[in-house]
């Protein structure tokens, strides 16, 4: 559901840039924290986006053009695919541009929301090693993320709170398994505008790196019930310095049913 279901912010970083502790967790566009709400059964959504992560002294990654596709394959079950191009800039190394790692996943909501309980779901993902890690365009090995997400709406849906987290399993050379989690609060302001802010933290992603915590703000504009413009900017507030951002276009089809 587009109102709260935002996918995929951070690209899969690679090589030296990963060792420099990149943002390794993707989340609901344009935020890092995800939600448990799948695409409606028989519906589809597509994102075309770019995103960036700049770490002074360590380099930068710009993802784009990238495409995300989500399908409501069954009631309460969504299939997920991201195919990104990526540009990496690392001090002392040649710039690289090309196809990076492919993300696939399945979102399953096993508790639906009611007046007294939140909705809860899992969203396991695999980052397939389709990029050229020798050029810093991929991890070099397939790795996995295993999160659980919780969401509750308030005041007739004007306020929405998402929280949750999980574990990333990455056994590529120089990489580490780590935990991650976040808290996101969003407010619908009417006239097709929603804004939100979040705190997101993750453990050390690579040998020699440190845990990092981010503060991120953003939102989306809905010119119609099928099309949206997404945006966010953020910065680390603990750990290694990172400046991040996301801009994307979203389209859902067929037209959502009227509430």
Residues covered by each model-derived region:
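Bacterial N-terminal signal peptides that target proteins for export
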Residues: 2-13
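Bacterial N-terminal signal peptides
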Residues: 11-22
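Transmembrane beta-barrel domains of Gram-negative outer membranes and organellar outer membranes
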Residues: 25-259
């Amino acid at each position: 559901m587009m109102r709260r279901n935002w996918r995929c912010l951070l690209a899969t970083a690679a090589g030296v840039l990963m060792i420099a502790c990149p943002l390794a967790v993707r989340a609901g566009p344009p935020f890092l924290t995800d939600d448990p709400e799948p695409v409606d059964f028989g519906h589809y959504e597509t994102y075309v986006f770019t995103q960036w992560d700049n770490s002074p002294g360590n380099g930068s990654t710009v993802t784009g053009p990238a495409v995300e596709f989500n399908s409501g394959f069954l009631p309460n079950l969504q299939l997920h695919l991201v195919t990104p191009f990526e540009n990496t800039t690392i001090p002392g190394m040649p710039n690289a541009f090309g196809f990076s790692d492919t993300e696939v996943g399945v979102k399953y909501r096993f508790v639906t929301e009611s007046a007294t309980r939140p909705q809860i779901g899992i969203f396991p993902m695999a980052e397939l090693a389709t990029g050229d890690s020798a050029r810093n365009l991929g991890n070099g090995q397939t790795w996995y993320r295993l999160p659980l997400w919780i969401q509750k709406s308030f005041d007739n849906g004007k306020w929405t709170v998402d929280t949750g987290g999980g574990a990333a399993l990455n056994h590529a050379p120089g990489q580490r398994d780590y935990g991650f989690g976040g808290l996101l609060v969003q407010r619908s302001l009417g006239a097709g505008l929603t804004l939100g802010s979040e705190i997101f933290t993750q453990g050390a992603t690579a040998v020699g790196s440190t845990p990092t915590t981010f503060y991120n703000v953003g939102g989306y504009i809905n010119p119609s019930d099928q099309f949206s413009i997404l945006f966010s900017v953020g910065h680390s507030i603990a750990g290694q310095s990172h400046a991040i951002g996301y801009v994307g276009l979203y389209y859902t089809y067929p037209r959502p049913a009227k509430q």
